[in-house]
């Protein structure tokens, strides 16, 4: 009876430690995912800003050229 209690106690103890380690790894993985999302969001915002700036520059140039042609001052 005593050996059975000892083995059950050992089994419970090892299972608890194993579960604790799995939860720590899961939490660590979730933290890495948040950083990756932030990095992706940062890259996408940068690309969007660059495209927006380039689009504004191209549109401004096109409007200047069109107004020059319409007024005949070119």
UniProtKB/Swiss-Prot annotation:
Pfam entry (one): FSAP_sig_propep
- Propeptide at 23-40
Q: Please tell me in which tissues this protein is expressed.
A: Expressed by the skin glands.
Localization per record: Secreted
Per the record, the GO terms for biological process are: defense response to bacterium
Family the UniProt entry places it in: Belongs to the frog skin active peptide (FSAP) family. Brevinin subfamily.
Reported function: Antimicrobial peptide.
Q: Which cysteines are joined by disulfide bonds?
A: 68-74
* Protein's name according to its UniProt entry: Brevinin-2Tb
Q: An example Gene Ontology cellular component term from the record?
A: extracellular region
Record key words, sorted: Amphibian defense peptide, Antibiotic, Antimicrobial, Cleavage on pair of basic residues, Disulfide bond, Secreted, Signal
Signal peptide segment: 1-22
């Amino acid at each position: 009876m005593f050996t059975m209690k000892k083995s059950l106690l050992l089994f419970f103890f090892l299972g608890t430690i194993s579960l604790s380690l799995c939860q720590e790894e899961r939490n660590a993985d979730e933290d890495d995912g948040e950083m990756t999302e932030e990095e992706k969001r940062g890259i996408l915002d940068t690309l969007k800003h660059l495209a927006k700036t380039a689009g504004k520059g191209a549109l401004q140039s096109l409007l200047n050229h069109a107004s020059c042609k319409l007024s005949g001052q070119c």
